[in-house]
Amino acid sequence: MKDGFVRCASATVDIKVADTDYNTSNIIKAIEDAAQNNIKLIVFPELCITGYTCGDLFLQKILIDSAKDSLIKIAKATENLDITAVVGLPYVAEQTLYNCAAVVNGGHIKGLVPKLNIPNYAEFYEVRHFTAGKNEVTYVNINGEEVPFGANILFKTDACEDFVLAVEICEDLWTAMPPSVNHALAGATIIANLSASNEVIAKDEYREMLVKSQSAKLYCGYIYSDAGYGESTTDLVFAGDNMIAENGTILARSKRFNNECVYTELDLERLVGERKKSNTYNIVGSEKYVSVKLDMNIGDTKITRYVDKQPFVPSDDKKREKRSEEILSIQSLGLKKRLDHTHAKTAVVGVSGGLDSTLALLVTVRAFDSLNIDRKNIIAVTMPCFGTTDRTYNNAVNFANSLGVTLKEVNIKAAVNQHFADIEHDPNVYDVTYENSQARERTQILMDVANKSGGLVIGTGDMSELALGWATYNGDHMSMYGVNAGVPKTLIRYLVDYEAKRTNNDILKKTLQDILDTPVSPELLPPKDGKISQKTEHIVGPYELHDFFLYHLMRFGSKPSKILRLAEVAFEGIYDREVILEWLKVFYRRFFAQQFKRSCLPDGPKVGSVALSPRGDWRMPSDASYQIWAKELETL
């Protein structure tokens, strides 16, 4: 359970209705197999020891006694296994029959959780046999041991402080106020649901929606185990629709109509991180809950779950198109409001033939179109200098012309050389002064053009550059409204591609496609043989790595060691551990050192769950030490 990862399973085994010996044998085998696969928690369906469809046989004492004996056997089977199992059975307490879930671990029955909501409608008639349980925890004696009995039980372990298990049963989830709500507010990070949900047309879709929604609302892992083949088909069919969800995402799901065991790793640190960030998620006092300790080992869980190497970019084409349109709409509406509020006559955008300025101009055009303002009031300024190549220059010119905006060219070589003379800088020394002088000269021109035309300078810098501080302070770092400030570099490429695919303008399409094929570069150093010599990703590292690091740092507050571990999984076969670690060190060093630039960012719209605005999502002192992060990085 290192880094908060715990491997969990949802299993449906073959059963025979009312044959507790057969069912118990299959349950124990599934538990043993799961333990061999380093699974720490396995959940079985509702009433799996007897079968859900026993009907009036539930009123037979021999069946109830046999189920209790089977539970003792199942618990005994876990004695030498590092696993916790949750199984379903009918249980009599104080002369009343309950539909229960039993949690077994280390050879013991750790707790019995009764079903609170007993359905008695349509095909369900559980009230005929079962009584609704209570939240209050009492104790029952099973095989000489006092076992907690009630809904309000939290199962915890010293092996992982974030592991807190609670249980609800089938219909409990379908109600307006599922027990899992209170469980989660009491601290539960994992909800186990033992279910017997029969199949009717499209019910699987609703079932999935419930599981996803509950895991999202509660910031929890949700393990749903469904009855399957072997249940009586007298009137109903059960398909074993097992699911494991985490914060609104289905991580694993079985193929329906096949009894299967599905497993994956839940990231409990991630869930707790989400809860800590949300001040409206209030963990209430747990005085009404009983905590039960489970015997579990920490271990080093191998990550088998999918880790997205581009977490900012939807992998599905249709979702990506929808997301692209949504982001462009957010950006353009933000700019539209600012233009409208300031009564700006123009918008000034510096165009370089690169991705960022391309997106900024596309957004500006959208804003002007929505305001019904002539595109000629958009002034695209190209400012060639020492590092400008013919390719980027021509793309900038063709791009602006194809959009129908006003194009202005200001060659800044003479101005920068004069500046070098004024400050006594040798123009043959290609240092930070050489580079930043060009960036600041460009910003000065844009600001002055905006003043002259009564307009606003539209910022082009993206979120990835801001995270790394890859911007000249008071140069391209500054603008009057930064439309790209909330968009990471890996996503910008897809936004530009989206616009390229949807345009009917052949020149614009061709130009955008060539811009997409151009290496990312600030073009501040002279080209070699007419080609770009200064490639950003050769200097600061691959943006796909940095965006991955940024996402996990900002979204979940993950430690460097965990981010490295996740990156190794996500980028397997692309980057080896040493390369990832090298750029991870660069990322942390730059992220901390460059906060002073982020502390004085221009306004700009937030577009995603990760943002760096000092007025909103990220308030970090500019002089914070990164010593403890660096210390951990050196141990990796």
Stretch-by-stretch model annotation:
Residues E161, Y219-C220, Y229-S232, E246, ...:
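ATP/NTP-dependent adenylation/nucleotidyl-transfer catalytic domains that generate, transfer
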Residues M1-V348, R366-R375, L407:
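Enzyme catalytic cores with a strong preference for nitrogen-chemistry domains
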